[in-house]
Amino acid sequence: MANTADVIIIGGGIIGNAIAYYLAKKGTDVIVLEGGDHIGNGGSSRNGGGVRQSGRDPRELPLVMYGIKNLWPSLSEELEVDCEYHQDGNLRLGKNDKHKQILEGLTERAVKVGLDVRMIDGDEVRRINPYLSDEVTCASWCPTDGHANPLTTTLGFYKTARKLGVRFITGEKVIELKKIKGRLRQVITPNNIYEADTVVVAAGYESKEILGTVEIDVPMSRVLIEALVTEAEPHMFDQMLGTAEADFYGHQTKHGSFVFGGSSGYEAVNKDNGTPICSSITAPCICRGIMKYFPDLADAKIVRTWAGWADQMKDGVLSLIHISEPTRPRLI
């Protein structure tokens, strides 16, 4: 039947596309349902492109470290697309004692899990990146971090998964998961009913409402983050950059333009009309933060800005759960 598969994946972002690709490599019959008109139109295409291990909760590190070591180095070749992956390190910058305490805590916790990350002083920071302001007094330095292009990477997973037979259906908003004889079997949309032995919910913030239809409560929220891209500039540096208090983050692309992201601090109290819309105050806030760290970028011209939702769990840690109760088998 056209509406049946071994696995149905709900969500067409980079996570859904990647899961579909790796399952299809093993010969699994997969359907991906995406509620929007296009794949990757959420956070997957709106983020700053960081491929990092540093600055994370230690519970995330084993999975992330595996990906950095085993997946990313050969991903462009495997997907036959330029993911623009650069593994040139990550500097998380600080200017004062408070910043240093934050960075030292993150570093100590990561080292205990086995990550190669260390604290460095301002002089060593500027040896790595001579464009940084003299105000920078410390940083955490993870040489195996990097950055990539989230657009081409998502598209690469999508195209390669399609070649392997994955069926992608856009404009199919899932409104309900349904059990038959006590077992989860059906995925309901306004126009169709789909059936599979296994259902993977990877729909970002929308996962909360979808899982609620089978009485699974997900403590999740979303935060509006904005990003900007500049005109192409002469090559300056290759590292991924961030700050202790997350004022901004970003990198220089292979094409010369800079991509930076961040927030103003007012996003939580701004009006939420259901769509990610840029605020008039956020880009100036990001730019002021950048100029304090990179005076040489003061005259860089912004080409465009955009906004996107950052989906996050209550504790800020990604959630990967296999629901194995008798009444809800094969739900991930």
Language model region names:
Residues 234-319:
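Active-site lid/adjacent beta-loop-alpha segment flanking the redox-cofactor pocket in flavoenzymes
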Residues 63, 93-102, 141-159, 275-281:
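Short beta-strand to alpha-helix junction loop
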Residues 5-31:
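N-terminal Rossmann-like FAD-binding beta1-loop-alpha1 element of flavoenzymes
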Residues 40, 192-237:
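Central helical "cap/lid" subdomain
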Residues 144-197:
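Helical element adjacent to the flavin cofactor pocket in flavoenzyme catalytic cores
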Residues 24-44:
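Glycine-rich FAD pyrophosphate-binding loop
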